[in-house]
């Protein structure tokens, strides 16, 4: 099991630094808490320039992930090829009049991410937008949970979701906040237009800065007492409402 896990990581300060310089993409980089020195300073500088998420963790956690001399640095290897955000949007607009995109704001569970991607692929979504920081890593478990959909649906990572949302708005997309607090039922929202649907985090929903840039809200009507659905289930429901409207 350890050997299988290690195929998903690159470790050692020099190999990781050189891989970043060469343009290798990583989901995130783990650095041992308390690590210091010029090599670590250089690594952090490169990671910031390339907008790669960095997390400081105890040595015990790092030792549990890989066998060998990791030197306080472990990088998660990206399991997919990301596409440039603007290229993804413009490509979809060149192919169809009303593309459909999904924006995930703070979805951190890899299994939820995989399930959402699976539904998105089945619904014919033109792309998924993820934040570079604060979201689930697309690791082997996420790809497996997606039944391979993450290898088929275009995925873009952006350093700032708000910038991406302004781009959608400038491109005449409506941005739909999927929220139980929305005033309108999803059945009353016209999803036949060029649309980007925003799904929020499992615990807190859509963040206020992102919510403020949405142009319309859509609520999934429910009759039970709990009042909320798992984010992957909610995403599937609203995506297939868009499919129904577009038939």
What do the predicted segments below correspond to?
Residues 1-91:
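N-terminal positively charged helical leader segments and presequences
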Residues 17, 22-23, 141-149, 208-247:
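Structured adenosyl-cofactor binding patch, chiefly the S-adenosyl-L-methionine
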Residues 18-25, 90-185:
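RNA substrate-binding interface of SAM-dependent RNA methyltransferases
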Residues 58, 78, 105, 131-132, ...:
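Short beta->alpha connector loops at strand-helix junctions that form conserved
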Residues 176-232:
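Active-site/ligand-binding-proximal alpha/beta "capping" segment
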């Amino acid at each position: 099991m350890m050997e299988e896990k290690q195929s998903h990581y690159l470790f050692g300060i020099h190999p990781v630094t050189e891989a970043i310089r060469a343009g290798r993409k990583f989901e995130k980089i783990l650095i041992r808490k308390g690590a210091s020195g010029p090599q670590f300073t250089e690594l952090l500088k490169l990671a910031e320039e390339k907008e790669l998420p960095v997390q400081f963790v105890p040595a015990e956690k790092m030792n549990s992930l890989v066998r060998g001399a990791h030197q306080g640095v472990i990088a998660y290897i990206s399991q997919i090829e990301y596409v440039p955000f603007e290229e993804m949007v413009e490509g979809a607009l060149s192919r169809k009049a009303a593309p459909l995109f999904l924006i995930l704001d703070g979805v951190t569970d890899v299994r939820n991410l995989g399930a959402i991607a699976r539904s998105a692929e089945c619904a014919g979504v033109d792309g998924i937008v993820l934040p570079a920081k604060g979201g689930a890593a697309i690791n082997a478990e996420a790809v497996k949970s997606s039944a391979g959909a993450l290898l088929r649906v275009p995925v873009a990572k952006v350093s700032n979701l708000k910038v991406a949302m302004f781009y959608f708005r400038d491109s005449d997309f409506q941005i739909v906040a999927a929220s139980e607090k929305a005033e309108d039922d999803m059945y009353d929202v016209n999803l036949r237009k060029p649309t980007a649907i925003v799904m929020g985090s499992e615990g807190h929903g859509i963040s206020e800065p992102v919510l403020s840039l949405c142009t319309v809200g859509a609520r999934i009507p429910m009759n039970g007492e709990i009042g909320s659905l798992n984010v992957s289930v909610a995403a599937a429901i609203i995506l297939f409402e868009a499919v129904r409207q577009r038939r």
